[in-house]
């Protein structure tokens, strides 16, 4: 996979009847738990509830970062996200990012002026890795470096690489469906 640890999301906002400040808020929610019968009626097994302990949660500039460890297997996950704002085809570099960190949630917020009909784009890069792939000392630096690389590559390159990868994948895939003809 071209960049198996990276996911990219692009949000476009175009004010139709408004000129003024547009705010973007991005959250990293660490308050996750296994589904129960209440939250998913097809689930009928345990263990229920929160089984991932938070080891680190932080927000710095446009970066969110989290590490957590499962209670029973002690597998760990590290993830983060980075953000860029684009207007008129140019990345907006001198934005002020405000951040807050709670016990199980962190967020970053920024804003930018936009005119009616002007499109503003938020590019959000997300990176995940686990203790199955990297040791504890390597995970944080890996996530932060991958996020930086993804921001440098940008959405268009990442999308191009993913399309090329998927085209090669499906070219080599040998899928036959029989029955119900």
Predicted feature residues:
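Acidic/polar, glycine-enriched structural segments that form the non-catalytic walls/loops
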Residues: 1-181
């Amino acid at each position: 996979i071209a960049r198996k640890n990276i996911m990219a999301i692009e949000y476009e906002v175009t004010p139709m009847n408004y000129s003024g400040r547009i705010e973007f808020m991005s959250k990293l929610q660490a308050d996750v738990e296994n589904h129960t019968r209440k939250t998913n009626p097809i689930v009928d097994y345990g263990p229920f509830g929160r089984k991932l302990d938070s080891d680190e949660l932080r927000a710095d500039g446009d970066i969110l970062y989290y590490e957590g460890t499962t209670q029973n297997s002690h597998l760990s996950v590290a993830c983060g996200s980075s953000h860029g704002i684009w207007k008129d085809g140019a990345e907006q570099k001198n934005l002020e990012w405000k951040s807050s960190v709670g016990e199980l949630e962190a967020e970053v917020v920024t804003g930018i002026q936009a005119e009616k009909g002007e499109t503003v784009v938020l590019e959000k890069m997300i990176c995940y890795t686990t203790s199955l792939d990297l040791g504890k000392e390597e995970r944080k630096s890996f996530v932060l470096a991958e996020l930086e690389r993804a921001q440098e590559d940008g959405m268009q390159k990442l999308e191009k690489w993913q399309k090329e990868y998927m085209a090669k994948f499906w070219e080599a895939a040998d899928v036959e469906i029989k029955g119900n003809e």
